[in-house]
Amino acid sequence: MDVATAIRDKLTSALKPLRLEVIDDSARHEGHAGSRPGGQSHFRVRIVSSLFEGMSRLARQKLVYATLAQELAGPVHALSVTARTPDEAG
């Protein structure tokens, strides 16, 4: 399974998002520190979930990072997260 699919599957299972985008930005970082042959090392995640209600931005990011701990310990070098509630997302 590719890394983007693993990220999508784990976030979908754990956070029940109303919207989820997983963007592989690895090509933009080719040749930089942490880049891997074949990419799949730099990602952006945009997620909207009602589970974020009442949580600070930091707490939301920590929840996403905890959900993806295995990927962050291995193939993922960089992860940018935008985590919003349904009301914030509009």
Whereabouts are the PLM-identified features?
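A short interface-forming secondary-structure element
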Residues: 47-57
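C-terminal structural segments of small proteins and small subunits
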Residues: 55-89
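Histidine-centered active-site/metal-ligand motif
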Residues: 29-32, 42, 61, 77
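N-terminal first-folded block
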Residues: 1-36
